[in-house]
């Protein structure tokens, strides 16, 4: 029950946070971590698949961080509304 509540809360934050890129990226990382915990607790993943999943997740986080840094360097803020200008 707690996992489904966390999933719905993560989806709500991800869908409603469209003003700041940092909040969107953090909620996306929360959803991926929740998906990982669901797959591990349901014994759906073997250990090697778990490490591959975590490696891809770390790469996704690094790419999101690099996009955030380049956005802040170019516009001075992490607000998504500056992308339209």
UniProtKB/Swiss-Prot annotation:
InterPro entries associated with the record: NUOK/Mnh_C1-like (IPR039428)
> Which spans are transmembrane here?
21-41, 51-71
EC number of this enzyme: 7.1.1.2
Which Gene Ontology molecular function entries are recorded, alphabetically? Answer: NADH dehydrogenase (ubiquinone) activity
Which UniProt keywords are present, listed alphabetically? Electron transport, Membrane, Mitochondrion, NAD, Respiratory chain, Translocase, Transmembrane, Transmembrane helix, Transport, Ubiquinone
Q: What is its main location?
A: mitochondrion
- What domain of life is recorded for the organism? Eukaryota
EC class (word): translocase
Q: How does it sit in the membrane?
A: Multi-pass membrane protein
Q: Which reaction does it catalyse?
A: a ubiquinone + NADH + 5 H(+)(in) = a ubiquinol + NAD(+) + 4 H(+)(out)
Query: What is a single cellular component term in the Gene Ontology annotation?
Result: mitochondrial membrane
Tell me the disulfide pairings in this chain: none
Subcellular location per UniProt equals:
Mitochondrion membrane
| Recorded family membership | Belongs to the complex I subunit 4L family.
Its biological purpose is as follows: Core subunit of the mitochondrial membrane respiratory chain NADH dehydrogenase (Complex I) that is believed to belong to the minimal assembly required for catalysis. Complex I functions in the transfer of electrons from NADH to the respiratory chain. The immediate electron acceptor for the enzyme is believed to be ubiquinone.
Protein name, per record:
NADH-ubiquinone oxidoreductase chain 4L
Per the record, the gene is ND4L
